[in-house]
């Protein structure tokens, strides 16, 4: 698959893990290892942006073992870039996730580019499956304390009807973090 669409037959030249050339013809490179991919598809790596775990592991466990296990499961199926989604019924879960994520992001060429947080500023009527059973107003002291010491959070979901959620979204935007609406009773209007 190329930006121009599907290519029926052709060759891909890879050196040191980088694609050097994609062509409709056969490539003859002296000393190159040839992999016959007839009947297969070659596609760019997948970006997993809302992924809670995999391979029997849950990112919300907030352990290196869970992160490694889930990442390995997704890499096996073509994900090259992963934004682990962590369900956070309370702010302490985010602290743990940040610690593990920062460690994983220190690894050169690692697949994790940042965290996606769901909670705790969600409508409890719409987030019961996340173990959020009470309204948690978006507390600037709480979220600023976390965001001022890390840059690994790339997306943070909240329900706009929660007190303080609009200010929270504006703060996220000011820091270059994607603010997403989630688990809400809000309507389009």
Residue ranges with predicted function:
Residues 1-28:
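N-terminal metal-binding scaffold of metallo-dependent hydrolase/deaminase domains
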Residues 12, 17, 39, 50, ...:
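Divalent metal-coordination and catalytic microenvironments
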């Amino acid at each position: 698959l190329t930006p121009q669409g599907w290519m029926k037959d052709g060759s891909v030249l890879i050196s040191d893990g980088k694609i050097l050339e994609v062509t409709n013809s056969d490539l003859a490179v002296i000393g190159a290892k040839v992999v016959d991919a007839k009947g297969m598809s070659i596609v760019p790596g997948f970006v997993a942006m809302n992924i809670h775990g995999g391979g029997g592991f849950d990112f919300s466990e907030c352990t290196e073992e869970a992160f490694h296990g889930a990442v390995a499961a997704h890499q096996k199926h073509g994900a090259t870039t992963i934004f682990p989604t962590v369900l956070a019924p309370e702010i302490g879960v985010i602290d743990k996730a940040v610690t593990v994520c920062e460690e994983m992001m220190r690894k050169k060429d690692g697949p994790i580019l940042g965290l996606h947080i769901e909670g705790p500023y969600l409508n409890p009527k719409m987030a019961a499956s996340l173990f959020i059973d009470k309204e948690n107003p978006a507390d600037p002291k709480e979220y600023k304390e976390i965001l001022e010491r890390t840059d690994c959070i790339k997306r943070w979901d909240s329900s706009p009807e929660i007190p303080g959620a609009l200010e929270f979204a504006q703060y996220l935007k000011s820091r270059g973090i994607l603010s997403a609406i989630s688990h809400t009773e809000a309507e389009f209007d």
